[in-house]
Each structure stands twice: as C-alpha cells, then as structure tokens.
Curated annotation (Swiss-Prot):
Keywords: Endoplasmic reticulum, Nucleus
GO MF entry, a single one: cysteine-type deubiquitinase activity
Superkingdom as given in the UniProt entry: Eukaryota
Name of the encoding gene: USP17L4
Subcellular location: Nucleus; Endoplasmic reticulum
Biased composition (Basic residues): 511-524
Record's keyword annotation contains Endoplasmic reticulum: yes
Membrane-traversing stretches: none
PROSITE patterns: USP_3
Name under which the protein is recorded: Inactive ubiquitin carboxyl-terminal hydrolase 17-like protein 4
Residues annotated as domain USP: 80-375
Family: Belongs to the peptidase C19 family. USP17 subfamily.
Region (Disordered), start-end ranges: 382-410, 493-530
C-alpha cells in the first residue's frame, strides 16, 4: 500500500460496514516495520488555554499551551469498526469517541510523543497512538483493539463506559508526565491531555452581611449533570450554575465579619475546555438503576452563559460524539456511540458495524456521555487536512485490505512485538488497575450536590482556594495523602489563624483587588487543596 493510499478524501457515501476483515493486533505486530506515518508539520497558530493563569503559581510547562501539534494530513473518511472480545462494547464505544476527538487524533498522527517517549513500561499514549492511527487508516474493516488498552480494567464483565473513558484519559495524562521526576500538581495541569479536556470551576461565596468574597477553584476533566429535574442539557447547566442561598443551618461562617451570616454561593466555569465531556447522571450510585428519560441536547451549545466572565462573545461548541447505553441498569445492556467524521458525516459505531446516519437520529438518543468541541478548534483541526493534501476519489487500492498495526509501527518504538504482547498487557496491569484508579476517585467522588459547591468551613476573608484535580496521576501506598495547611494572612488576628486539613498554602504576594463594601483587606491568599 503506497503512502497516498492512507489518506482518503472527497465524499465517500455508504450505508453500512459489516465485518469485511478482522485483524488482530498480536498477529499484526509481526509486520510492524513498513509503511511510514504522516510527516510532522509545523505547529499551527493560536489555541485557547488559560487555566487559572492569573492565580496559579509558576509551574513547569509539560506541553506548550500555544502549540498543540497538528498532523498535516489525516484520513477524512470514517475508520474501522471494532471487534467485541466479550463484554467489551463499553471499551469500543469509548475508543471510537476518543478516536474522533480531533485535537487528540491529530496529536497522535503527528507522532510527536512516540518519537520522544522513554517509558520502560507500557505507555498509554503510545498504545492509543497505535490504535487511533490503525483505526483511521483501516476504513471498511474491523480491527481488534489491543488488550493493553484495557489491561488492569477489563474483568470479563460489563463495565461502566464513563469509568473506562476517564480511566483512559487519566492514563494518557499520566503518560505525559516524566516518570522519573517529581512533578508538582500545577505542572500536571499543563499536560497536553489537560489542555485538551481540562478546565476550571470557580465557586464564589459572598457574605450578604459584610459583602466579603472568597473564591474556590477546582479543575475538571469532565462535567457531571444532574438530569433528575432537567428536560435538556441547557436546563441542567442552568441548574448547575444557579446561585445557591446559604442561610439557616447552612449559613456561612464569614471569616471577615466573624459572623454566621446568610451568603450566596455561585458556581461558574472559570476556564473552558477545548473538548467538553458532559456526563448525564443516569445511574444511581447504590443500586445502579437507570434514569431512562429523554434529555434534549443541541448540535451547537453556547457555554458563555455559564462562564465567570460575561463580557465576551459567544463560546460555541459543536457536538461530535455521543455515547449511548441501551438497557435498564448499569449491570446489563450494551454501549454504542455516534461520531462525526472530519467531512461532517455522522456514523453509528456499534462494535464491528459502522452505519451512516443523520443528525436527526443522533439527537434523538437517550445519551449518557456527550462530547463537544469548541467550534474554532474543530475548524482549525479540520483545515489542517485540506492544507496537507487535496481530496481525491476513493480508489480500488484503498479497499483491498486495512493498514495493519505491523505497517504502522515503524515509528512506534515504544510498542511491543507480538511475542512480547503478553508482557505488554502484564506491564499495563502492573502500572494501573481499575481498583487502584477507583480508590482516589471514590475519595473525590462528585456527590449529587456537587462537591465544587461545598463550602469550606470558616474560610478566612478573600481567600482563593484551588483544589487539585480529582484525577490523580499517582498514589503513594494507594492512600490519598492528607497534608496540613498553614495560613499566612497578615490582615488576620492570630486567633483567626486556624490549621486546615485541606492542602498546602501558597500566598499571592502583592496581589490586590478592589474592596467591596466593608471589605478593606487588600491582600489575598491562595489555598491549594489536595
């Protein structure tokens, strides 16, 4: 297969892919040394990433914020179907959504990570790079995902698609970190994965007695929406950012006026993610029963009304993938997904079956997870294809056989050959398991009332609290660390200085803000929470 045959363009109309060819990665690994991948291209212009730039301490940049790599050329048609290896529909549905996440796919096709990866053990970024490249270069075929993708997670039974999705995203984020060096959590939030999927919540508490204000910032990789009383995603978002009144037993103990007074708590998005993962909370935490109701979601979503800063223009996101669960509880049923290929056509991805469908069909599903991308990001990454190569008609040579992992591995030194595939799975299992991943997630689990709304007890006045991401990239002895914090507030009396088991404090020297009402304290402190 020539280099040109890997890049498909123009209009490719078809109604259904059945199992034309089934390729197994362990067999394909033996051939890994032939066809080259797309050439690396210059990095494209602006990207929008501004996670707490004015608040966070200086951190080591693990990925340049303004330089997300773009592949100069990539397939424009839909890629391969995925073989179900037994209760792996949740894995297949998640992988298809990630494969059609343009910033991630273009980064994988640029080969930037695999060319510099020095991890001695299994690397999720390298494994995902091989999978995404293989899937996109195998249109009309069915491929078998590598066992290493779910090693440590799959236990031979149906799993939750959202858990596997975030397990994979977290593993990729971990792979961005230098394994042999200690990295502070501020630097962890500069990884490429966080730049794509990450944003930051802002919870602002205003004392209605003295008008003192305290802000809490909490990073996120996905947003969970309560749909009990919502008929649409917009309603769920409106409920999420609706100001909450704190009074009576829930009155706020203000650190400025030192009174237990009524207050308002407003939750907004301080920074927006390039790719927005919205999780509709359909399953109960205990019994796993499903809330089977229709919740409307738009093809285009303006997130500006939910942002902290309201003086800018629309912030438009476009839908590009939908995860659907069919069944009555999280313990049964199956998962499938809908994805939008780069030319704009929607496809239903149901394991091995790839079916063309309309946007009307996509918007009529009982969605579980929704994937939105900033419109500007979609256009920027889509344009990288047309700049790289002119579209051409589909030729017979393109449908003879799929591109195998063997052909695609020449520039993937981190991947293993077939005889070492079992070791690859074993190493992946040793590095991260579902139970190890779930432990810190349970400690930081989003409760129905959303823990980003949780009011910190007796916060000092004008404190900025920044929580560490709940998606931790490592654990010591598999237990969450509890660290004490020291408050250095020159404006407070020693009797007001309390020890808080919430994290490590980093003060903002010289940072001031305009006082409101009786608030005459000009210095603010930054409380960074584990």
């Amino acid at each position: 297969m020539g280099d040109d045959s890997l890049y498909l363009g123009g209009e490719w109309q078809f109604n259904h892919f059945s199992k034309l060819t089934s390729s197994r990665p362990d067999a394909a690994f033996a051939e890994i040394q032939r066809t080259s991948l797309p050439e690396k291209s210059p990095l494209s212009s602006e990207t929008r990433v501004d996670l707490c730039d004015d608040l966070a301490p200086v951190a080591r940049q693990l990925a340049p914020r303004e330089k997300l790599p773009l592949s100069s050329r990539r397939p424009a048609a839909v890629g391969a179907g995925l073989q179900n290896m037994g209760n792996t529909c949740y894995e297949n549905a998640s992988l298809q959504c990630l494969t059609y996440t343009l910033p991630l796919a273009n980064y994988m096709l640029s080969r930037e990570h695999s060319q510099t990866c020095q991890r001695p053990k299994c690397c999720m970024l390298c494994t995902m790079q091989a999978h995404i490249t293989w899937a996109l270069h195998s249109p009309g075929h069915v491929i078998q995902p590598s066992q290493a993708l779910a090693a440590g997670f799959h236990r031979g039974k149906q799993e939750d698609v959202h858990e596997f999705l975030m397990f994979t995203v977290d593993a990729m984020k971990k792979a961005c970190l230098p394994g042999h060096k200690q990295v502070d959590h501020h630097s962890k939030d500069t990884t490429l994965i966080h730049q794509i999927f990450g944003g930051c919540w802002r919870s602002q508490i205003k004392c209605l007695h003295c008008h003192g204000i305290s802000d809490t910032f909490d990073p996120y990789l996905d947003i969970a929406l309560d749909i009990q009383a919502a008929q649409s995603v917009k309603q769920a978002l409106e409920q999420l950012v609706k100001p909450e009144e704190l009074n009576g037993e829930n009155a706020y103990h203000c650190g400025l006026c030192l009174q237990r007074a009524p207050a308002s708590n407003t939750l907004t998005l301080h920074t927006s993610a390039k790719v927005l993962i919205l999780v509709l909370k359909r399953f109960s935490d205990v019994a796993g029963n499903k809330l089977a109701k229709n919740v409307q979601y738009p093809e285009c979503l303006d997130m500006q009304p939910y942002m902290s800063q309201q003086n800018t223009g629309p912030l438009v996101y476009v839908l590009y993938a939908v995860l659907v669960h069919a069944g009555w509880s999280c313990h049964d049923g199956y998962y499938f997904s809908y994805v939008k290929a780069q030319e704009g056509q929607w496809y239903k991805m149901d394991d091995a079956e790839v079916t063309v469908c309309s946007i009307t069909s996509v918007l009529s599903q009982q969605a579980y997870v929704l994937f939105y991308i900033q419109k500007s990001e979609w256009e920027r990454h889509s344009e990288s294809v047309s700049r790289g190569r002119e579209p051409r008609a589909l030729g017979a040579e393109d449908t003879d056989r799929p591109a195998t992992q063997g052909e695609l591995k020449r520039d993937h030194p981190c991947l293993q050959v077939p005889e070492l595939d079992e070791h690859l799975v074993e190493r992946a299992t040793e590095e991260s398991t579902l139970d190890h991943w779930k432990f810190p997630q349970e400690q930081n689990k989003m409760k129905p009332e959303f823990n980003v709304r949780k009011v910190e007890g007796t916060l000092p006045p004008n404190v900025l609290v920044i929580h560490q991401s709940k998606y931790k990239c490592g654990m010591k002895n598999h237990h969450p660390e509890q660290q004490s914090s020291l408050l250095n507030l020159s404006s407070m009396n020693s009797t007001d200085q309390e020890s808080m088991n919430t994290g490590t404090l980093a003060s903002l020297q010289g940072r001031t803000r305009r006082s409101k009402g009786k608030n005459k304290h000009s210095k603010r402190s930054l409380l960074v929470c584990q």
